[in-house]
A protein has these predicted regions:
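General detector of folded, globular domains
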Residues: 1-211
Length: 211
């Protein structure tokens, strides 16, 4: 099936949209990086307006791993919201991925950088990992929990409902467009790289002409 995709060429001016979770009404404010048409529907590659957050568990050996979903009870989430609020950070229960905002984010030091490790579903010994900043730490039912700001770019897929409003697609819809969406995201990020190169060239030119 043919997929027709379009990348926002001006990545610094990506349109702001909302990703809606069917059944709950919860919303995730996003910017749209790219879109494609598939079987009469429009799908978008979206990235959150606010910083993406994940909850992690600290193991006895010091490793940080994502918290299992069955442990993410309303009581635990409420405790995480309270721990973040004490640091002037608002933890948002947004769909697909939790997010955070607030002045306290600017006070997070680089020393709080940790590695978050993901188990490999294929059984490979080499686990995936990414850098994350610790926003808050707490104990809940004898469990050491950390609220982490993940640093790698995060993209989610939405299906257009109406202008500026997307909804979380079904698993079948996601499977149908995932590969093309990933390709469009690569093109979008390459646009960011080109803009950075142009900015650096401009700075160097200014220095060359400095009296």
């Amino acid at each position: 099936m043919q997929h027709e995709g379009e990348v926002d060429e001006d990545s610094s001016d990506a349109p702001e949209v909302v990703l809606l979770e069917p059944g709950t009404g919860r919303e995730l404010p996003c910017f749209m990086a790219a879109s494609l048409e598939y079987e009469g529907e429009t799908y978008g590659a979206l990235y959150p307006v606010h910083v993406p957050v994940t909850l992690a568990q600290e193991m006895q050996n010091g490793r940080l791993v994502p918290l299992d979903e069955d442990r993410m009870t309303p009581e635990l989430v409420a405790a995480c919201v309270k721990a973040c609020a004490s640091k002037d950070i608002e933890l948002l229960e947004t769909p697909v991925v939790m997010t955070a905002r607030g002045s306290g984010l600017e006070l997070i030091e680089d020393e709080s950088l940790r590695m978050l490790e993901y188990s490999d579903d294929d059984g490979d010994d080499d686990d995936d990992s990414e850098e994350a900043l610790v926003l808050a730490e707490l104990k809940h039912d004898k469990l050491s929990v950390l609220v982490l700001q993940t640093l790698e770019p995060l993209y989610v897929v939405g299906k257009l409902l109406e202008e500026d409003t997307f909804e979380v697609p079904t698993d079948e819809e996601l499977d149908a467009v995932q590969d093309t969406i990933e390709q469009l995201v690569v093109e979008f990020e390459e646009g960011f790289d080109d803009e950075d190169d142009d900015l650096l060239d401009g700075i160097e030119d200014d220095e060359d002409y400095r009296p």
